[in-house]
Structure formats: structure tokens, C-alpha cells
């Protein structure tokens, strides 16, 4: 933790806003550049603008963080090094990252730049933080859904610097777990192009249209003391696509209350609300898992009824000492803090007529114009009978200020970047390569996998001999009897020569983690193949609590590029699942050693802490499906996972790629998975009989931008 209580982190969509939020009191600013940012439709910064922004901020003791918080394709990864290098050399303070491959590359090639993991990484627990710390991560941006109590525990257990969202728009889905916009229209949130389908109306179980997936804006200004007690260091304001007046106004109020430590007045709270909100404010996630009062229910227009005046540009105070003596070089020494610079001109000559007036000379030096500086005091030592032309005084001032500016900025500059040879980042461990080669030479050169979430599905699937591997969902089992029930299923399946993996939940919050740790020793004794993991918490736990168990990454542990895949496999992972947003061409050009492909299944569009069941019918803690219907009359199943307390919203149609298995084999894929989630036994039979009436190809043909 840093010395100060908080860092106030503000958004900036352009250079004008960056300067405005800094003048309004931001300690740090996050921006997007021309590539790899999660706001692809924002103006974003050109290279020239971003370099100017870095200098402007550093002169004022403010940090600049660059968003590289999207998933990067293989075809793009080679551009990353050159893109970052110019900013790294200039002193960029940190990069905010989603892709584990980008984390690996930055840690390798840009050793003195901080790495902040994005909320897109969906980190919800201490074990996720522990895993990421192995890659040189210096700060973790917590998932917005994580409570203050959870943050406090994470900070106490790991000591990691934590960043939390404090103000602005809330996604309905856990960030990084949303494919809604991607699947419906090809605009991927993982690529910075979300079309915000959560802000549209839906019919729930035949009732009138409601904005059931739209959350109110976050406002945590009344919880500053509690955020401090929880160990949060950086307070993040959302809004890189917001206007200058909004950004500056919000920063101004947060700055005031951070510094004063006073309770927030009702009048100021209303003024903040007037700057902009969607149907009011909420800070519910800080204290509760979810709540119906967080939802807008009505059309979530962003309403702004007030504009704070733009802050005036404040100049930086410097001291000066002017020395003009006959026969000696004229000098102007300027100082800011502990940094000084001395500029010189030609030796001063004697006056032939009127000598130089001391006040006139000081006034001339004081004319700093449109520079960033102004003199607080100028000490002058001027001979009695000397003359210096105005042009020479102007040059002396310009050279002094320019030299001081360069010297102030030079301490941020870096020259320690390592040469990038990306091929060295993509290698897989030798045992993985050998295993794949052995698999390739086998008579049966591919594996068929099924995953199931219910007992009825398992009872149906066990009768099909075509499946070599079964993924059994963690939440099929009652917690009190999990070990015994799972052991029975493993024994039953292994008698049929089937391999078994335990498929862990999409979200693994503290309660789930504690339970998992408590059963780990007994679970490790069960003779099953390993785990399918869906988050960084599970990856760390399975890596450290079990011996001889394989770990497979599910599709949402994104291996969009070969560097990401290598990063995971170096930490003991045995296999990965091809990300759902890659198209056939991209799949052909990735390293598919150890990869499996989902060739059937309803794609999950959202994983959410808020519960559609609870918010429409009340919470009865009974798992069942209800359906959302959109304006095109498409129905989306919502499944409530009550043990882990999250919802999954599924696509209206299943994706079916079984006819493409031959092509996928050519791409080097050897394992093919049928992912059963919401299907009844009758629907499973239709899948196995190749009689699915309606289905989609997902992103196999089109992909995402």
C-alpha cells in the first residue's frame, strides 16, 4: 500500500479531458490508445497526443495508465511490442491488461512498467490474486461485484494493491464473462466493441417489457471510509466516453471528500447525481451480493442536468535566479522542487547608452506565455552598467524553462526495454507436445467429450458409448455429500472405461473457495482425471492443492493467442478450450496442441451476480429455468446457480459444429466436446440423433472484429 490513503483514478477520452481531470484533482488518469483498448468506439489518443499526455501528467506528479484490456488475436500480437515501446520509453506508468499473454509479454520485455489486471479478468478472490502475482502483476482491479468485506480479506491475505470501481456505469454481467453483444451482433465486449444489449427491454415469463438487465450507475462517494478500511488503494471512475464537464465534475467532488474526510452532504450528492446518472445511483455491491433496487427496470437513459465549469489551467510554480554581470555569460537558473537547470547566453556587455533596468529585466523573464510554468519569485543580480537585448532575455527564459522541463521529465524516461522475440513466448512445455504427438499416433486419433450439469443429463449420456470423457459439473452435487456422490459417479464411469473430470463453477467467490479448500484432501483421494477450471481462483487452487490431477481450461479462460496459451501451460495446465469467438481461419492459425473444441452447446451469453429469478419472482433458492424474450421474439434461458449464487443467460439457439469436425482435425484439434447445459433428456437424444431443428454456427464462420 502506498503512503497516501487513496489514488483517485479518472478516465480521459481525449487530451482536453485528461488535462481537465488532472486540474480537477485526479492522482492518475487512464486512457486508450489507437489499439487494444476496451472502448474501440471512443476517440482515443493518437501516439502524439498520448506522448503529450504523459508529459503533461508527469510534470504535475500525475500517473498515466494505458488500457490494453482486450483479448488479442495471433495476427495482432506482433504489433504489441512496437505499440508499447514508444510509451514505455516516455515513462508510461502502467498498462491495464485483460489478456494473460499480454501480461506475460509486458513482464518479459518491459520490466520496469507496472501491470494492472483489468476487471475483464473477473478476479473475485485471493487465490486469483495469488495466481496473477506470479506474472509480476502489481495491482488487481477487482470485479465490480466483489464486496468490501471480500476486498478486505483479499488485501489482508495477499497484500496486493487493489483498485475498485467507485463511480459510473455498471455492466450487468461479470466483466469478461459477457458474449451477449458478440453472439447477437458480432460486436465483442472482449474486443472493446460492446453494443450494450443489457440496456434493452426484455419480457420475462410473458410479463410486460422491462429493462431487467440494466443496472443503475455506481456511486461510492458515501463509502470512502469503508473503502479505506477494506484496503482499497485506487478509486476508479468509469467514463472514457463521457464528456469533459461530467468527468471534471465527478473528479472534483471525489477529490474534495477524499481530502476533507467529511460526510457527504445531501446537496453535493444531488449535484453529483445531476452531473449524470442512469435512473439513480447504487453502491449495493459493496455490501450485498445483489439486489432488485440496483435494476433500472425503466429505459436507462443517461440523464445529465448540470454542468460544472471547466477547471482553469494552473501553471506550475518555479523559482528563478537571474545573473547579468559585465563580461560574464548571462545566466538564468530555474528551480522546481529539487530539480534545477541553468541556461546561459553570451557574455554581457557594457551599456553604450541607457543601462538595463532591473525591473524591466525581471518583467521580461516573467513572461512565460503559454508554457506550463510561472515564476513565484525571481532573484536578480544585475550589474549597474550592463545591457542585454530583449531578444537575448527571451532566449534565456525559453532555454531555461525548456531545459528545466526536459530535466523534470527525463527521470521518467526508460531505456531498459528488452528486445522482443515473440517466438520465445509461444513455446509449450515438452510434456504437452509429447503427449499430443502420442495422441496423434494412436489408432483412435481423437477424443469425444461430454459435459453435463444435471443428474438427468448424466443418466441419459451414460448410455451413449461414443463419449470417452465425462465432465461432471460441481453443482450437480449437494455440498454435504459431494465426496461420496462424486466418488460413486467416478467409479460407475471408470468401470465403463470413461475418464472423468470435475467441472468447477464459472464464478468462485470466497464461500465457494473456502468450501473447496475444506474438501480438497478428501477429493484428492478420489481417482479421477482432473478439473475443468473457469477462473483464476480455481486455477491457483487446483495447481496447489492436488497431486497428479490434470487441469483443463474452459473456453472463458481465454487463449486467444499462442502467448496466452503458453503462459497457462507453463503453470501446469494440461489442455485448453478454443475460445468461442474465434473463427475457422483463426482456429487454423493457432497452436492447437492440447486444445479441445466445443462442437455442440448453448453458448453462455452472460454470467451475473444479480438474479433475474430473485428480481422478478423472489428468491426461493430453487434452480430452474426462466426465459427472457427480446424485441425480435428470441427466447434466452436464464439458469440460476443457487449454490454459488449466480445466473447464466444462454443463447436462444445451440451452436452445432459437428459437421466441421473433419476441418477441425486438420487444424490439429484432437478433442471435441458436447456441452450440455439446459437440455432435457429428450433434447439430448435429438442432438445425438442429429435431429436438432434449429441451430447456429456461432462465430465459426464470421468471428469478431
Q: Language-model segments: what does each one mean?
A:
Residues 2-123, 141-145, 149-234, 241-705:
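Active-site pocket-lining/capping segments in soluble small-molecule metabolic enzymes
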Residues 135-136:
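Hydrophobic alpha-helical bundles that form the membrane domains of multi-pass transporters
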Amino acid at each position: 500500500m502506498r503512503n497516501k490513503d487513496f489514488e483517485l483514478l479518472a478516465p480521459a477520452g481525449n487530451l482536453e479531458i485528461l488535462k481537465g481531470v488532472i486540474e480537477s484533482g485526479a492522482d492518475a488518469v487512464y486512457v486508450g490508445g489507437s489499439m487494444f483498448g476496451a472502448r474501440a468506439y471512443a476517440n482515443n489518443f493518437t501516439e502524439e497526443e498520448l506522448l503529450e499526455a504523459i508529459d503533461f501528467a508527469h510534470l504535475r506528479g500525475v500517473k498515466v495508465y494505458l488500457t490494453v484490456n482486450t483479448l488479442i488475436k495471433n495476427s495482432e500480437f506482433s504489433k504489441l511490442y512496437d505499440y508499447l515501446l514508444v510509451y514505455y520509453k516516455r515513462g508510461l506508468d502502467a498498462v491495464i491488461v485483460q489478456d494473460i499473454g499480454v501480461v506475460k509479454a509486458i513482464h518479459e520485455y518491459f520490466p520496469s512498467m507496472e501491470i494492472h489486471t483489468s476487471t475483464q479478468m473477473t478476479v473475485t478472490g485471493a487465490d486469483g490474486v495469488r495466481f496473477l502475482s506470479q506474472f509480476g502483476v502489481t495491482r488487481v482491479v477487482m470485479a465490480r461485484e466483489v464486496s468490501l468485506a471480500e476486498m478486505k480479506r483479499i488485501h489482508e491475505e495477499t497484500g496486493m494493491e487493489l483498485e475498485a470501481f467507485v463511480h459510473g456505469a455498471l455492466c450487468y454481467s461479470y466483466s469478461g464473462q459477457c458474449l451477449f453483444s458478440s453472439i447477437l451482433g458480432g460486436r465483442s465486449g472482449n474486443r472493446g466493441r460492446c453494443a450494450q444489449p443489457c440496456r434493452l427491454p426484455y419480457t420475462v415469463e410473458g410479463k410486460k417489457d422491462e429493462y431487467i438487465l440494466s443496472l443503475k450507475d455506481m456511486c461510492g462517494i458515501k463509502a470512502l471510509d469503508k473503502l479505506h478500511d477494506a484496503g482499497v488503494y485506487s478509486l476508479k471512475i468509469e467514463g472514457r466516453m463521457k464528456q469533459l464537464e461530467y468527468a471534471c465534475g465527478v473528479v472534483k467532488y471525489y477529490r474534495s471528500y477524499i481530502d476533507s474526510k467529511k460526510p457527504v452532504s445531501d446537496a453535493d450528492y444531488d449535484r453529483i447525481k445531476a452531473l449524470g446518472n442512469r435512473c439513480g445511483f447504487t453502491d449495493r455491491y459493496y455490501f450485498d451480493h445483489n439486489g432488485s433496487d440496483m435494476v433500472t427496470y425503466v429505459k436507462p437513459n443517461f440523464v445529465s442536468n448540470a454542468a460544472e465549469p471547466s477547471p482553469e489551467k494552473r501553471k506550475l510554480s518555479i523559482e528563478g535566479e537571474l545573473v547579468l554581470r559585465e563580461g560574464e555569460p548571462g545566466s538564468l537558473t530555474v528551480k522546481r522542487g529539487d530539480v534545477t537547470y541553468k541556461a546561459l547566453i553570451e557574455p554581457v556587455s557594457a551599456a553604450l547608452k541607457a543601462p538595463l533596468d532591473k525591473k524591466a529585466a525581471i518583467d521580461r523573464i516573467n513572461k512565460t506565455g503559454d508554457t506550463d510554468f510561472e515564476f513565484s519569485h525571481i532573484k536578480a543580480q544585475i550589474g549597474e552598467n550592463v545591457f542585454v537585448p530583449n531578444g537575448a532575455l527571451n532566449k534565456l527564459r525559453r532555454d531555461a524553462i525548456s531545459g528545466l522541463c526536459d530535466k523534470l521529465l527525463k527521470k521518467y524516461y526508460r531505456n531498459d526495454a528488452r528486445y522482443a522475440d515473440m517466438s520465445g513466448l509461444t513455446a509449450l512445455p515438452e510434456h504437452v507436445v509429447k503427449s499430443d504427438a502420442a495422441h496423434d499416433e494412436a489408432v483412435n486419433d481423437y477424443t469425444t467429450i461430454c459435459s453435463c450439469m444435471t443428474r438427468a443429463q448424466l443418466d441419459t449420456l451414460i448410455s451413449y458409448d461414443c463419449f470417452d470423457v465425462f465432465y461432471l459439473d460441481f453443482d450437480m452435487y449437494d455440498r454435504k455429500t459431494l465426496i461420496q456422490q462424486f466418488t460413486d459417479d467416478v467409479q460407475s464411469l471408470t468401470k465403463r472405461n470413461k475418464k472423468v473430470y470435475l467441472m468447477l463453477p464459472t464464478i468462485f467467490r470466497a464461500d465457494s473457495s473456502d468450501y473447496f479448500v475444506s474438501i480438497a484432501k478428501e477429493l484428492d483421494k478420489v481417482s479421477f482425471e482432473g478439473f475443468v477450471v473457469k477462473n483464476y481462483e480455481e486455477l491457483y487452487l487446483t495447481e496447489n492443492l492436488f497431486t497428479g490431477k490434470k487441469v483443463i481450461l474452459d473456453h472463458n479462460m481465454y487463449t486467444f493467442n499462442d502467448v496466452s496459451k503458453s503462459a497457462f501451460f507453463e503453470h501446469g495446465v494440461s489442455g485448453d478450450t478454443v475460445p468461442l469467438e474465434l473463427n475457422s481461419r483463426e482456429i487454423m492459425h493457432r497452436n492447437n496442441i492440447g486444445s479441445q473444441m466445443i462442437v455442440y452447446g448453448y453458448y453462455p451469453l452472460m454470467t451475473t451476480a444479480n438474479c433475474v429469478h430473485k428480481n422478478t419472482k423472489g428468491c426461493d433458492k430453487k434452480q430452474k429455468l426462466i426465459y427472457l424474450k427480446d424485441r425480435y421474439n428470441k427466447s434466452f434461458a436464464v439458469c440460476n446457480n443457487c449454490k454459488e449464487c449466480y445466473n447464466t443467460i444462454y443463447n436462444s439457439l445451440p451452436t452445432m459444429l459437428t459437421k466441421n469436425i473433419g476441418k477441425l482435425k486438420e487444424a490439429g484439434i484432437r478433442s471435441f466436446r458436447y456441452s450440455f447445459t439446459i437440455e432435457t433428456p429428450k433434447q439430448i437424444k435429438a442432438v445425438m440423433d442429429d435431429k436438432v431443428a434449429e441451430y447456429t454456427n456461432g462465430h465459426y464462420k464470421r468471428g469478431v472484429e
